[in-house]
């Protein structure tokens, strides 16, 4: 298998220490959501090894598949899950309760088919999705959810600023964040 298709992590994904302990080798596995039942032997397969950092105890996979392989054509759609659609409305209501600015702009990174942006749009908020899956962008567009296709990076941020025609800060309601932080320390 080509090394451009995946890389083996040498450091912990959380603490960056080089103390990875191999736990379970699950052999070569097809990508989730990419199973081709007609020709299973043609499915791309990648090593799947579970390891644990001896330092911070985080259990993680040892191999990282190239994101383009994983996400440029993505098959699962958020809208297929009744629970996700229901939760998107609850999530929207909760986030709106934290907002302290007029005319907020909602940006969802990894927006999939736009399901989580729909409730915000229905409330009259400006929304934009960013997702690398080229096959999901048309689905979002049909739902009148604007989307930029690509991996979230500086280039995408520049596109967003250009689309909005002004520099915009994405802020996290500082006042509420501080009170949540204080509350979590008290618990």
Task: Kindly give the residue locations of the regions a language model identified.
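N-terminal juxtadomain amphipathic helix
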Residues: 1-83
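Conserved class I S-adenosyl-L-methionine
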Residues: 103-112
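Conserved SAM-binding loop of SAM-dependent methyltransferases across substrates and taxa
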Residues: 113-124
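Conserved SAM-binding motif I beta-strand of class I
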Residues: 126-131
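Conserved SAM/SAH-binding beta-strand->alpha-helix loop
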Residues: 133-135
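Conserved SAM-binding strand-loop segment of SAM-dependent methyltransferases
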Residues: 144-159
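A conserved beta-strand element that flanks and buttresses the S-adenosyl-L-methionine
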Residues: 169-172
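A short, conserved alpha-helix within the catalytic core of class I
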Residues: 179-187
């Amino acid at each position: 298998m080509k090394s451009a298709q995946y890389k083996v992590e040498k450091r912990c994904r959380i603490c960056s220490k080089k103390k990875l302990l191999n736990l379970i080798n699950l052999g070569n596995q097809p990508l989730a959501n990419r199973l081709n039942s007609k020709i299973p032997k043609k499915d791309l397969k990648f090593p799947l090894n579970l390891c644990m950092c001896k330092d911070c105890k985080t259990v993680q996979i040892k191999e990282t598949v190239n994101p383009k392989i994983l996400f440029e054509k993505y098959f699962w759609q958020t809208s297929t899950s009744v629970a996700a659609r229901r939760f998107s409305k609850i999530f929207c209501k909760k986030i709106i309760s934290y907002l302290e600015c007029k005319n907020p702009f909602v940006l969802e990174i990894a927006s999939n088919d736009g399901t989580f942006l729909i409730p915000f749009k229905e409330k009259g908020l400006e929304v934009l999705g960013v997702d690398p899956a080229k096959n999901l962008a048309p689905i979002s567009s049909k739902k009148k959810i604007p989307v930029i296709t690509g991996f979230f990076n500086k280039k995408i941020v520049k596109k967003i600023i250009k689309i909005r025609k002004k520099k915009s800060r994405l802020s996290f309601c500082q006042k509420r964040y501080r009170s949540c932080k204080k509350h979590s320390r008290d618990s």
